[in-house]
Amino acid sequence: MEIQVVGMERLDDFMGLMETTGQRDGFNIRPKSYFERMLDSLGEKVRLYMAFYEGQPISGAITTNFGGKTCYVYGASDNAHRNVMPNYLIQWEMIRWAIETSCWVYDFQGVSGILEESHHMYGLYRFKRGFNGTLDELAGEFDYIYQPLKAKMVDQAIALNGAMRTVKRKLQHKN
């Protein structure tokens, strides 16, 4: 397995991994244009890491580095070759970058907040917790709703989409 710091030339590979991860874990992903803007605007303060196994991209992650803090902001992996655990090696390389740039904090960012093994996002918590960090609970996000009817419709559409992804994921696992 090989880990590389790559640029825009590998963004399509990363997006494919994001789509696979989103389908597997039941979450929506941001559009490619979002990641293009992130990589373009943050310059030297952002890195896209990719893991390759037998020449194929099997995992990717985006990390930012600013003000003494390195943040793991996005990660994705293929369904194939999960047994070689590329996400751990990518994390190690990102932690090395944090050390090289004299960061004093490596932030894995958030987890769902529901820390029950039965929750579908528990694996993300287990992965991050495996690095022996601490879980810091912050205030979170606040939204001001200025068009309640439209907001309710969007919330219902998102919930329906999530439910459909869950059903699809369960059907795929049965086959």
Segments from the language model and where they lie:
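A conserved beta-strand-loop-helix scaffold within acyl/acetyltransferase catalytic domains
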Residues: 1-83
